[in-house]
């Protein structure tokens, strides 16, 4: 039954926004023209019909233009700038035209015999009326309406259904879910909530992901058909043909209109999110986790974890934070207090958690691009952990924006390191210079000189190294050897060590390796590190 209802409405469409100068002619979109009309319209006239009248209007087609006869059609339907027309192709050169207002509700026409006005040419015009009350507005499009994909509804991940949908669709105001079916018959379940003040339903939590999945970009218009009522309504969605020449101009104005209404809602959500967060931190301090290395860590936004829509949490988070291995969901809270629920899974073989299904959308929503580094803080433990996320503070100008820049910086620091070694004239392979840089802090990795590997002073099977400062405090860090580069690198702890000792980018250490101890000097001060 669903397919039958859809197939009856899924005829070729294209839309035309009425821009200044539309009165004399309109241009058929190039894509629609080449697919359905090219080579068939020569010497013929298109026929236009509408629900406003039983008249069939004959319009001359000159290439892609509808010219002679179009002005009469526009005057008879009292078309105005910013109106939107949906042309449904009925076959041959016959089109059914449906006018929509700026709010994307169908314009209703009423015949007023006593007010019909005849102009000097003897043509009769009709008075256009758009009903304002909530019960009648959009009455003819309550179950078949058009929704624009705008920058604002993508940013807030939601859009509003027409007011008439509330009553005529038979949907209960208690409905909390709705199913969207795309062109490939793939269903997506989204959040549905009723706004009492505006008497409208709002679709949220999944709208942006749905558009991204189907390639619907800002400026697209989607025809939405209600194909099933009930506790969980079902909507069928397919795109209308776009006018590549004019729709971009019109979408900017649409964006401004819709953005004004939704910006107020967004600001309200931000404030309420901050209040909820503050109450959470004050109400139950026992559940707050410490800002140790394992509950306060850095995650890079990479092309790989964006492509796979997932990333791994540090292994230490499994034990030190007491995170339950049975957790299935995790909440990310961004800088504005907005929450996103993502899937969480635990791998026994790796002994670590993986966040998936929503990571890519979260980054897109907050404009975290590839090359960014995010600080994640575990602020609440329990059945559904809560992580606060914000971009890592940048030293100097900014953190490296992509892996190429990081690589260049590492190579530069390596060259600088070699120069420092030459100036120090250290012939002993057990002594070498290391520098604190933006890149090795961001990556939490310190690459040791290659000559340390060649000197065979360190066993390549060693996996840990102990650093000891002048006060005798020690840090156990991971040590790995790369066969590919032939170098040792210190990982998982280098950044914490530097922060604990107040070392920032630009500091330089003279490292001295002893039998079971590594000794560092900084500005003449001895630092012993095992």
From Swiss-Prot:
Disulfide bond positions: none
Domain of life: Eukaryota
Region spans: Disordered: 251-276
Keyword annotations: DNA-binding, Nucleus, Repeat, Transcription, Transcription regulation
Localization in the cell: Nucleus
CDD domains linked: B3_DNA (cd10017)
SMART domains, per the entry: B3
DNA bind region: 11-103, 144-241, 296-393, 431-530
Any one GO molecular-function label of the UniProt entry: DNA binding
GO cellular component: nucleus
Positions with biased composition (Basic and acidic residues): 254-276
The protein's name: B3 domain-containing protein REM-like 3
Species of the source: Arabidopsis thaliana (Mouse-ear cress)
